[in-house]
Curated annotation (Swiss-Prot):
Enzyme class label: ligase
Interval spanned by the transit peptide: 1-18
UniProt protein name: Lysine--tRNA ligase, mitochondrial
InterPro entries cross-referenced by the UniProt entry: Aa-tRNA-synt_II, aa-tRNA-synth_II, aa-tRNA-synth_II/BPL/LPL, Lys-tRNA-ligase_II, Lys-tRNA-ligase_II_N, Lys-tRNA-synth_II_C, NA-bd_OB-fold, NA-bd_OB_tRNA
GO cellular component, one term: mitochondrion
Keyword Hydrolase: no
A Pfam family of this chain: tRNA-synt_2
Localization terms from the record: Mitochondrion
Cystine pairs: none
Family affiliation: Belongs to the class-II aminoacyl-tRNA synthetase family.
GO molecular function, one term: ATP binding
Its EC number(s): 6.1.1.6
Superkingdom assignment: Eukaryota
Length: 531
């Protein structure tokens, strides 16, 4: 008997619901999936094997390769004496009398017509009682193998003219919806959504071409792709709430929120240009643009300043757009990447919207009270935790970014209190000296795409910035602020060269490049609520 542990959760839930917990699999299928059992038997009666291996020549040429190779060759009604064996999934079946059938076969999202003409497949005697029954035993969704000569139909459609009956490779035992539109059902069975809606498949393929282009861009510029810990005692330097677990010895562990501190330690060790594409985890809410598990790319370059990183960022965004879309126009957006990206300075832009000159923006209680009073005056809802950093972030989002969503723009010179891992500077705005960070954020089409720093490499300065964060964590209850990382400060004591660091949310970039407004659409299995 097969153990219950080998059965899928879906099957087990059905068995439990129907009080059939003692049924073994073949009984389950015969009683509750009679249609599946009947089709398997019907195929067997015709001598059709259900799950055979493919022949050795089946994978040599795929449908996309044939389409590309013969795109501009062969005239209407011409058949070339070039034979191919192709595999794919049936997307539609049409008959013309009892001697002619047309199958549309999909390989990914590329479709090729296969024409079955009785006279080309065998003699009348050989095909007697076989041709139509064998074809009609197949249905939409089945995976098949076909062999024949390439040609073009009378209507001009590129086709394979079969010289033998199709070989069933794997039957589809459930009906494929013509068009699956229910949002919840699409993500409950994402594979069915991909089979029913070619757009879903195309979006996911585009996602991975974007990721591939990011890798290519950095590799061509001398960056080495690396891996850093995902599960550790530190969650990585980002301002976020981590997922916490423990090991077998009950020692606390977290899933990383960002790889930043690990990557900078690699730079200290001598790896001067590194990048990492990988998963991060933040124990936060789910909405149209946020998922607790997400993909990011972070890159660090020794002996590069912030201006150099801005230039590199513009080059990357244009490179990806050209690679994916073939031009510098972003899908579904009136965004033109040909022009230079606009630059907005954080404090002047905020002061302009408020029509006030802000006093020094620091971690003091006076500054916090000043900002809270501005929130009340502007009738903006306060953030959950009213640290100076959170207050400034929400105020800027609400007053400045809300009305600047079209053209690409760099936001620069954030207040120091918002960027504890960035180098600092002092700048005069009117009559007020403000401590600012050497940082930029890139916004395109309303999305925050990138965040970059000239990295703080003074261990004493970094220690004091961590201590200021500690106040927010302990006194103001900000559980998104990481605890001071003494190991990282110790690493800085060995000398981090002047370094520009950069992070990009890959999921949001994919949303931008594909014109999607919901993050679930560009994730293979949707957001966390569906997995």
């Amino acid at each position: 008997m097969i153990s219950r542990g080998l059965l899928s959760k879906g099957i087990l839930s059905i068995i439990k619901r129907k009080n059939t917990g003692n049924l073994i699999p073949h009984v389950y299928y015969s009683e509750y999936h009679a249609d599946i059992e009947e089709r398997r038997k019907a195929l067997g009666r015709l001598g059709i094997s259900l799950y055979p291996s493919v022949t050795s020549d089946a994978s040599t040429t795929t449908i996309p390769v044939i389409i590309e190779k013969w795109r501009n060759k062969i005239t209407k009604s011409e058949i070339a004496m070039v034979r191919y064996t192709v595999c794919g999934r049936i997307s539609s079946i049409r008959y013309s009398g009892s001697k002619l059938a047309f199958f549309d076969v999909l390989y990914g999202n590329k479709k090729l017509q296969v024409v079955f003409n009785k006279k080309n497949i065998g003699t009348e005697e050989e095909m007697k009682g076989k041709f139509i029954p064998r074809l009609k035993a197949l249905q939409k969704g089945d995976c098949i193998q076909c062999s024949g000569n390439v040609g073009r139909s009378g209507s001009g459609e590129l086709s394979i003219y079969a010289t033998e009956l199709p070989k069933l490779l794997s039957p589809c035992l459930h009906p494929i919806p013509v068009k699956l539109t229910n949002y919840e059902k699409r993500f409950e069975k994402r594979f069915v959504d991909m089979m029913s809606n070619t757009k879903s498949l195309e979006l996911l393929e585009k996602r991975y071409r974007i990721i591939e282009s990011i890798r290519k861009f950095f590799s061509e510029r001398g960056f080495l792709e690396v891996e850093t810990p995902i599960l550790s005692h530190h969650f990585g330097g980002a301002t976020a709430r981590p997922f916490i677990t423990s090991d077998i010895h009950k020692l606390p562990l977290t899933l990383r929120c960002a790889p930043e501190l690990w990557l900078k330690q690699l730079v200290i060790g001598g790896m001067n240009r590194v990048f990492e594409l990988g998963k991060n985890f933040r124990n936060e809410g789910i909405d149209a643009t946020h998922n607790p598990e997400f993909t990011s790319c972070e890159a660090y370059c020794a002996y590069l300043n912030l201006e150099g990183m801005k230039k590199l960022t513009e080059e990357l965004i244009r490179f990806i757009c050209l690679t994916i879309n073939g031009n510098l126009q972003i899908s579904g957006q009136t965004v033109d990447l040909e022009k230079g990206f606009e630059v907005i300075e954080f404090i002047p832009a905020l002061q302009k919207e408020l029509n006030v000159e802000l006093s020094p923006l620091d971690n003091s209680e006076n500054c916090r009270k000043q900002l809270i009073s501005i929130f009340k005056r502007c009738e903006i809802m306060l953030p959950k935790t009213c640290t100076v950093a959170h207050l400034l972030d929400k105020l800027f989002d609400s007053l400045v970014l809300k009305y600047n969503t079209s053209s690409p723009k760099f936001v620069i010179n954030h207040p120091e209190v918002m960027s504890p891992l960035a180098k600092s500077d002092i700048k005069l705005y009117g009559a007020v000296e403000q401590r600012i960070s050497k940082r930029f954020e890139l916004y395109i089409g309303g999305y925050e795409i990138c965040n970059a720093y000239e990295e703080e490499n003074d261990p004493v300065a970094q220690y004091h910035k961590f201590q200021a964060q500690k106040y927010d964590r302990l006194q103001l209850g900000d559980d998104e602020t990481p605890a001071p990382d003494s190991d990282f400060v110790h690493a800085l004591e060995y000398g981090l060269p002047p370094t520009a660091g950069w992070g990009m949310g890959v999921d949001r970039l994919v949303m931008l490049m594909t014109g999607q407004s919901k993050i679930s659409e560009i994730l293979p299995f949707g957001s966390l609520r569906y997995v």
